[in-house]
Amino acid sequence: MNRLHDLDKIKFGMRYTIYSPLDGQPCMDHDRSEGEGGGPTEYTGIKMEVVQWSKAALEAIGNVVEGKKVFLVAATLRPETMYGQTNCFVGTTLDYGLFSANDEEIYVCSYRAARNMAFQDIIRPRDNPVKLAELKGSLIIGTKIKAPFSVNPEVYVLPMEGVLASKGTGVVTSVPSDSPDDYATLMDLRKKAEFYKIDPEWAALDPVPVLSTPTYGEMTAPVLIKQLKIQSQKDTVRLAEAKELAYKEGFYKGTMSIGEFKGMPVEEAKPRVRQKMIEAGLAFAYAEPDRFVKSRSGDECVVALMDQWYLDYGEEKWKAQAEKLLERMNTYSSETKHAFEAVLNWLNKWACARTYGLGSKLPWDPQFLVESLSDSTIYMSYYTVSNLLHSDMTGSKPGPLGITPDQMTDEVWDYVLASGPFPSNSDIPKESLQKLRHSFDYFYPMDIRSSGKDLIPNHLTFAVYNHVALFPERHWPLSMRANGHLMLNGKKMAKSTGNFLTLRQAINKWGTDATRLALADAGDGIEDANFDDTIANASILRLHTLIGWCQESADGGSGYRTGDFTYHDRVFQEEFINLAAETKRHYEATNYKDALKSALYETLMARDWYREVTFEEGMHSDLVRQFNRTLVLLMAPITPHVSEHIWTTVLKEEGSIQTALWPDPPASYQPCPDLIAAGQYMRGTLKTMRDAEILLMKKKAKKGAQGGPAAYDPAAEKKAVNVIVANRFPAWQDDSIEIMQRAYDEKTGTIDDAKVKDELAAKGLLKDKRIMPFIQLQKKRIAQLGAASTFRRQLLFSEVEVLKLLIPYIKKNLKLTDVSVMTVEEARSSSAAPDTLIEQSEPGSPAINFYNP
């Protein structure tokens, strides 16, 4: 805090802050039971003086306002549109108070708004607004008021259905030219004046052009109402859409059509109009929380304007540094990065002191305590030296260097953490200080800060700001990871509902490793994870099965062989080496669900395929041991105890698995993508053959029911298949690929669709209904596999040779008497299949023809 103060990052002055009147101090995020992340929203309070009360209102208030001016106060975010006021709205069912603002003025608004005003010195006394009278909104209807800055000097108060007591002041100034809500309500009132119990003359003023936009002209609201087909003020969904469109278009693209700032962009005119109104005494600055905020003491919070110490977050240069860190820091997901960016855009002047509670005293102003979130942003750096400074968890016992807390002065900390000069006035031995600095330099910057997503709006963003302020760039954080909350069986954990589980309960129920496995499976990232009982239960069996497999395979036996590796051996080895590399990438990215998938599920799938496809000759004993060793190493971060047991007791490896190296291949290893592709091809082709036979079985059943013969009988004693392999793609596909390749932009990674269509049309290919679906499929492949792989369209292996190696397994698995692998040309010359079926064959996707010999 001292160094931030020295750097002028902490300042003192009047500012808006969320404040708890009951607690008598600012209410920051960790002091709230509701409304975390909420901050002040600043409005312009428009003072609309009462000219003539409605008869009902006059009777209700009596003589309480004698000698004072009375103003209806509206809170607006668009002061630049006040030139176009045609009326004012109130909610007929809402309660409005007449509050004494000062000796000469009375303000009409909701109690909630008056309470906020009282803590901003708008209404006196400061902490207790005096309510002189109360009125239902329905009684105010028909009151004539002044409309400051409007071309219509006087307007009437009218009813509106959507006015909220929880937002603004409960009084809404109406500008129907630019507010869709105002225009829709005004039209409703004109159509049904009798229903709404108003005099038609009160709603007679037409919308006034205030600003001009390129899209909607000078009547933004009427145009949007017509375009979106909004029928009344009850169409809240489309009105919300229209409101957003109107505000964005008006603020960013609009120019003023009226008043002193006519012709000026709205973005520039808005603050000037506001200032003019305030200087003329026709308006004032007003703020309130942007959402409902409740303190932990149960108090509804307000926005207070007060002198206080604050961290100058949002200051231009400091913010630029924070953005620089965010740009280079790994956030592990775009959602997390966008969340940080959003916070940096709104975070501004954070109150860093309070009057009571837990916390350290503010060093230069000890009447205040440091707010809890403000001094918890660089404590990670303390972890790097804490073991040298104290020998117990509480810090009450000196550490091995024998340094006491009072010796750790600001100058000493500068030397240790900020590469400052050697503190000549310190009585700590130089050797000890050097050890502290060395320990910090060795461990910092932090590689990762993992925390909840709810801390992005405060703690984590504060850590970004304070690290760039206090540390040189080489010590800036390398990454921050935000995670969601943990649900239990798809529902939010809550003691009140009984859907609650502690870590100790989980360990007692499922054991440590099964619990860890279920937690890894629960999910990663910023979305909420889900711990599932069924996964935890299944994990126990899965781990016992894993131990059993390793024990059985380690014992050896006649089922294993030795000698040279076969093709299936090489495919299997390449697959688990590749899965080890993939798992490593997932662990490094802290994606534990994906790591579990590749480390356990996909690895065991590869083993199962290998075991089945080598049923005749058996698995290779050396390869199985290498696989088991790799498998337990991959699983060690998730299931350390089971992995340790298998490593030492079953595999008889030396030392602990915790000190073993990751199973990276040797430096001489050369990846073989052709083997990976062949493995995927074999599994995919077998599935295609199964699916094809199932389809034939369904057709047979259907024809049998209709009394017709079937060409192939899956139940026959003798069954065979011809697998027909194509050496080249159809000409229309080759033509399409060539056209796409010419239309591909390497810089943007996109296809020029117009160019593709032009070339297809020129070659007469557009009429072929197969073309466009094929092109869309290739676009997806480009996104998934890259342009080079998609355009190359060549298999990395010999399809015929791989299929011939697979023949024994195909026969066994599908219970076939014969399997023939042939080329398209061979199939045609021998009439091994109908021509229509042969034509379906493509490289990587053979045609399948079942028959009964």
Label each region the model flagged:
Residues M1-Y83, G142-K146, N152-E154, K167-V370, ...:
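Residue patterns forming the tRNA-binding/recognition surfaces of aminoacyl-tRNA synthetases
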Residues L4, L72-G91, S295-R296, E300-V302, ...:
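Conserved phosphate/anionic-ligand binding catalytic regions in large, soluble enzymes, centered on
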Residues H5-G39, C109, A113-L135, I140, ...:
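Amphipathic alpha-helical
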Residues L7-F12, N152-P153, L189-L205, E279-A285, ...:
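Secondary-structure transition/capping motifs at alpha-helix termini
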Residues P21, D29-E36, G559-K584, K597-Y601, ...:
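Acidic, turn-prone loop/beta-hairpin segments
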Residues V50-Q52, A147-F149, P153-A165, P176, ...:
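Alpha-helical recognition segments enriched in aromatics with Gly/Pro capping
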Residues P79, Y83-F89, L94-V171:
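Protease-associated
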Residues D533, N537, G655-P853:
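C-terminal low-complexity, glycine/proline- and small-hydrophobic-enriched intrinsically disordered tails
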